């Protein structure tokens, strides 16, 4: 049975969301079509408001309402530590575990030949400038334990190799291979950071 083209377009739009397959996209499409106009208008308004009013921090790319996010502007954070993560979800996951009190840098992607993602498509290229302009003594690389995450970590280490007086670490055992931080529980995150391994002095 064929569906209206508008329905198929709605399903395609929903499938573009992370982790949403055809089955769930159709389920959500049917749900949305069954709602009244007020629900739909409010739903759309919330998306537009979020897109309009939420911006990225000029330092770390964390989301907030100001140029400088609540973490980067918090005087109680440890400004000598910088943790490099891949996504906003990774940052949120670590923050929710209350195991780290330094600053962050979100790369917004990992180097991937398979996905055609190069350095220029990410925030990796500005890490060195941020380190040079900051007072960091410790860099913790917390990219995923995947092929792309390891390639990205290696690139960051090489990029910072001529900067003296900083220690560079990689998150330790705990995060499974081919996995990312946002899937780890609190104890796993705690162990991976506590067991971070030094990869350069």
Curated annotation (Swiss-Prot):
Residue stretches making up the Toprim domain: 80-176
Record PROSITE patterns: TOPRIM
ZnF (C4-type) residues: 57-72
Molecular function as annotated in GO: DNA binding; zinc ion binding
GO annotation (BP), single: DNA recombination
Matches recorded under InterPro entries: DNA_Rcmb_RecR, Rcmb_RecR, TOPRIM_dom, TOPRIM_RecR
Keyword match Metal-binding: yes
Keywords from the UniProt entry: DNA damage, DNA recombination, DNA repair, Metal-binding, Zinc, Zinc-finger
Pfam family, one: RecR_C
Record function comment: May play a role in DNA repair. It seems to be involved in an RecBC-independent recombinational process of DNA repair. It may act with RecF and RecO.
Family classification: Belongs to the RecR family.
Protein name: Recombination protein RecR
């Amino acid at each position: 049975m064929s569906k209206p083209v508008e329905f198929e377009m709605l399903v395609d739009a929903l499938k573009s969301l992370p982790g949403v397959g055809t089955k769930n996209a159709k389920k959500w499409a049917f749900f949305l079509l069954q709602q009244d106009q007020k629900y739909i208008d409010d739903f759309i308004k919330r998306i537009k408001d979020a897109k309009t009013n939420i911006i990225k921090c000029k330092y770390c790319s964390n989301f907030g309402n100001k140029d400088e996010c609540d973490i980067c502007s918090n005087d109680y954070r440890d400004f000598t530590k910088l943790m490099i993560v891949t996504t906003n979800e990774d940052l949120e996951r670590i923050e929710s575990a209350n195991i780290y009190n330094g600053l962050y840098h979100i790369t917004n992607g990992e180097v991937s030949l398979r996905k055609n993602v190069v350095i220029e498509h990410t925030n990796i290229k500005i890490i060195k400038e941020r380190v040079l302009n900051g007072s960091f003594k410790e860099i913790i690389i917390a990219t995923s334990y995947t092929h792309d995450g390891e390639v990205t970590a290696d690139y960051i280490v090489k990029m910072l190799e001529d900067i003296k007086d900083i220690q560079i670490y990689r998150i330790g055992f705990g995060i499974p291979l081919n996995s990312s931080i946002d899937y780890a529980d609190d104890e796993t995150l705690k162990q991976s950071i506590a067991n971070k391994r030094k990869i350069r002095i």
